[in-house]
Amino acid sequence: MHFHLPKPLHGWRAFTGEVGIIVLGVLIALGFGQIVELWQWHQNVATARQEMANELAGAADQGAERVAIEACLRDRIGELVAKLNASNGRWTADAMPSPPGANHSMARVYGAPLRGWSTDSWDTAKSTGVLDHMQHQEVAAYSAAFGEIAAIRDFQNEELPLESKLSFLGAEQQLDNSSRIGALEALGQLDTLNATISGLSDLLINQVQNLHLRVDRSSSAKGLQAMIDQQREFRGRCVKDVQVQF
């Protein structure tokens, strides 16, 4: 039995040409789709890069603030330790003035600034797949910087309960030995945390500066200076000037 293939209406040459046109059209459509997808990822990367730059610039300023007040916090710890060691059972209230915007009902005897240390832009970049479309070295640099931010935030969270634990020293009282030892232990931990956070902040500043971020340098410098001025008004001349060069 013989089978005869149906012949195209206009011949095989015309049919082949029509098929070629269809295939070419499909390839063009696929290529255009890939171009659109690449362009979209390019836009997503640019947006993510700017969001991370803005967040890192803010974190670097917060780090500079911690470096600026490191000596103030260290001196305050030393004052309280010396007073506790010299205590003969009677404690004289030694509260700090309330910082701007404070809403505590109890006086504080020690206080570091509470900052956000946000990593939202980095978390978003990881979850959306944007990092897969960036160079490995750049991603590694961002990862290191945001890792420092997360570490500083964790250490800051350790400071808060220790600060609260010392609030009782803001009132005059008869101080028993157990309370005195407990306060000294808390101050020892705060001393370590202060040095650690300041060291990590200094490292963060260097990492951020090496990224050569595209940010509003003038606005960032003004914001940092405002923070330092506020700290100096609150803590005095122990606050040193620190700059971040983007």
PLM regions: where:
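Hydrophobic membrane-insertion alpha-helices, especially the h-region
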Residues: 18-32
